Each structure stands twice: as structure tokens, then as C-alpha cells.
Amino acid sequence: MLKNLLIVLSVSYLFVACTGKDAKKQESAFIVMKTKSIKFADMGFIYSSSTGVKVEVYAAGQPLLDLDINSQNICLSLLKCMDKEQFNEEVLSASYPSTLLENIFKSEAIFEEKNLEKVEGGFKQNISKEGVYDISYSVISGKRIFRDKINKILIKIRKQ
């Protein structure tokens, strides 16, 4: 009887211990972000999962920026949360799609894969709309570079 109870508890523990967690991919990276309102270039960590992205940036070992991107909004250093469209308007450009920043941190194509060109080790995209944005974006061998010449935005992520 005790043996059967022990077996049931052991099997139950295995099922409970192996469920309910969202798998996360973690990477350390050198992150550069220059926009009209945010400027930094430091080491950090990027945590990706199916539910969103979390970015932590450190300067001299101290937390500098905490960016949490989920399906509805973007939270900046636990102080200010805003929906993705509002974040784009205030920090990036109102003309960008709401998924842009998340796609960059996840190494995914932007603007629904518009002008996607596969290259060795990744892909490139050149997207422009006269007077609104002039974007070059590449994800090649663990290095992501997003540059918008019109809005003067640069996001570089170099995997460490």
C-alpha cells in the first residue's frame, strides 16, 4: 500500500514539475539603442518566449533599462507602461507596425517580411516610404542592425 502511494506521488510530481512553464530563450548581447528619447550602448540580456520579450540592460553592473514587451503593451523600467502604438509614437515612429520592436529583439522580419532578401547567415530588408521612413534592417549571424535614416533611429544587437 505504501509502495503504491509512493509510486502515485512520484508520477504526479513528474507531471506537475514538467508543465505550466513558458519556454524562454536567453541571450547576452551588446545592445545599442538611439532614438529621440532613449540613448544607451551597454551589455544586457534578452529573454524571448512565445508570450513576449524582456530586455535588461546594465551599465557598470547596475540596471540601466528594463523593457518588457508583451502582446498588449511595452513597459519601460517598471515605471511606465503604454500600448505598443503609443510607445512607437513617443519613442520610435508612429508609422511603424506595433510588432516592430519585439520582432527586432526576436531576430524576426519586420513589416510583414516586406522586401525580405535571404542572405548567407540570415536576411536583409530595405523598406522606405518617402518622407516617412527609410529603413535598413539585417539579421546576420547573431547580429541585428535596424537603422531608419529619416527618423534617426539606430538599434544594434550583437550576440555575445
Model-identified regions with their sequence ranges:
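Sec-dependent signal peptide recognition
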Residues: 2-9
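Glycine-centered tight beta-turn/hairpin loop motif at sheet-sheet or coil-to-beta transitions
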Residues: 37-39, 60-62, 79-80, 128-132, ...
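Post-signal peptide N-terminal segment of mature Sec-exported envelope proteins
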Residues: 26-49
